[in-house]
Amino acid sequence: MGKGNSKLKSSQIRDLAEQTYFTEKEIKQWYKGFVRDCPNGMLTEAGFQKIYKQFFPQGDPSDFASFVFKVFDENKDGAIEFHEFIRALSITSRGNLDEKLHWAFKLYDLDQDGFITRNEMLSIVDSIYKMVGSSVQLPEEENTPEKRVDRIFRMMDKNNDAQLTLEEFKEGAKADPSIVHALSLYEGLSS
């Protein structure tokens, strides 16, 4: 699905409706827009970055967009096909908190080893700070990516092993609403 400008088959629409929080009608509408913007049925990383630039014109979203792109690109072929796009969009826009946090964990776990290290988190947080630019006024204790990451690790890394498991990440994010709010910074595409 996605190679070339093919129409979605009704069986594919049905499957996507079962796999996502979108109705068949919504999937058809999203598909129409996807094919309009990506006539070959593939969204490249450069195209993805361009979309983020529209949402964050005051900052530099290119690094963050690249990180998000890698999570959307499930089969790691260097392009986002419609089914990958709609599944990720479903989780980030309509998923429950656990689903969103699991998705966010995959975003932060850059090497996909099942843990978030301080450096991985710093890469993501730094890219978020670059993306939002000066549009968001941050409190003194979080006005640099390093301070933010230190605060998150102090709160989440319960066993002090300098890495976060999925469980530590979920528990910490649920305990601190500001972290869940910060996670929503990357939902510009779906809001």
From Swiss-Prot:
A lipid is attached at residue 2 (N-myristoyl glycine). InterPro entries: EF-hand-dom_pair, EF_Hand_1_Ca_BS, EF_hand_dom, Recoverin. GO terms for molecular function: calcium ion binding; calcium sensitive guanylate cyclase activator activity. Keywords: Calcium, Lipoprotein, Membrane, Metal-binding, Myristate, Repeat. Ca(2+) 1 binds at residues 73, 75, 77, 79, 84. Residues 24-59, 60-95, 96-131, 144-179 form the EF-hand domain. Ca(2+) 3 binds at residues 157, 159, 161, 163, 168. It comes from the Eukaryota. The keyword Membrane applies. It is a lipid-anchor. SMART domains: EFh. GO terms for cellular component: membrane; neuronal cell body. Ca(2+) 2 binds at residues 109, 111, 113, 115, 120. It is found in: Membrane. Neuronal calcium sensor, regulator of G protein-coupled receptor phosphorylation in a calcium dependent manner. Can substitute for calmodulin and directly activate PDE, NO synthase, and calcineurin. Regulates associative learning and memory in a calcium dependent manner. PANTHER family: CALCIUM BINDING PROTEINS, NEURONAL CALCIUM SENSOR 1. Belongs to the recoverin family. Binds three calcium ions. This is Neuronal calcium sensor 1.
